[in-house]
Amino acid sequence: MGYLSCKAGSAVAIAVSSAASTSGSTSSKASAPPESPIEDRPRLRRFLHRDLESATGGFDINNLLGRGSHGSVYKAVIGSRHIAVKRPSKSREISREFHNEFEILSRIRSPRFVNLLGFSADNSKEPLLVVEFMGNGSLYDVIHSDTVLNSGAISSWSKRIKIALQIAKAVHLLHSQETPIIHRDIKSANVLMDKNLNAKLGDFGLAIRCNVDDQKVKSTPPAGTMGYLDPDYVTADRLSTKTDVFSFGILLLEIISGRKAIDVRYSPSFIVDWAIPMIKRGKIGGIYDPRIGPPIDVSVRNHLGLVAAKCVRTCREKRPGMEEVVGWLTGLTKSVRSRRWDELSIGNPCMMVETVGGRPVE
């Protein structure tokens, strides 16, 4: 059906032969946290289109979970298991992104991703993807719904920092592959919450598996979502893993503040234009979600905001890598539990000129 890859040698055909070969894996050389291993070429199940169509009630709108960048997602039950079925839109460009998601997710699996479980590829029918069912919707819904807030999903800073850490680990896993994967569309709507309110990164339609010097990168137009898109990523040759770091920084500000990336009800409407000046003026407590107030521990309050500020630096070379971000957030989770600060040091020789309460924002 098609290929989409940065290197011809690593391309995966969306065909029956692809699924048949999934059990023969080669281990990745990339390092990953032991609690979030990546499985290379996971085993996939091939479904009949008619079975998936029936399981969704004929793609009944009552089973519609949401619409993504390249199709719709429906709830279904196969046997006793809840699954989600992704159905592509009819646009050729959308179909290409849909196939790209298959190419990426058919090769990796992790507890930090919304994993691919199977597919249907009947010649006379549209292709369908079967992914894990996430019972608590998207992080966007969690953050921006008072109903969910009241249920306790993000009612404490320990829970919010845990969610941020889980997302950071997901992005780090992508970047640490032997051939890095750049997601290009990290946002709260693409982070889904499972039944235990663990965060998983999904929607890999815009992702690219390649080294930044590959010709494929240089010929792929910039893409992403307004509000999360790296301002440095204006031409194809400016794509790098730091593009994802910027988007993660926006998402972290969203988790911290409870505000949307862009919200026209406020001035300034862009979350960076509002939050970063407050951090520079030493008013970091003012960026925290007023529904639960800032963290009690002043060190946690300051350092969490500083991590976000580092990620959204205009100069991409001064942004941290996701491995650093994972380390900082891991320290913060420990500090929130112990209410003391001794695990995190975010010193960096690339220092910004602004200060927080008289100290540099590094």
UniProtKB/Swiss-Prot annotation:
Keywords tagged on the record: ATP-binding, Glycoprotein, Kinase, Nucleotide-binding, Phosphoprotein, Receptor, Secreted, Serine/threonine-protein kinase, Signal, Transferase
Superkingdom field: Eukaryota
Statement: the UniProt record of this protein carries the keyword Kinase: yes
Binding sites annotated in the UniProt record for ATP: L65, G66, R67, G68, S69, H70, G71, S72, V73, K86
Positions of region (Disordered): 21-43
Endpoints of the signal sequence: 1-24
Positions of modified residues (Phosphotyrosine): Y233
Database matches in Pfam families: Pkinase
Enzyme class: transferase
Statement: the UniProt record of this protein carries the keyword Flavoprotein: no
GO CC term (a single one): extracellular region
Name assigned to this protein: Serine/threonine-protein kinase-like protein At3g51990
EC number: 2.7.11.1
UniProt-listed InterPro entries: Kinase-like_dom_sf, Prot_kinase_dom, Protein_kinase_ATP_BS, Ser/Thr_kinase_AS
Organism: Arabidopsis thaliana (Mouse-ear cress)
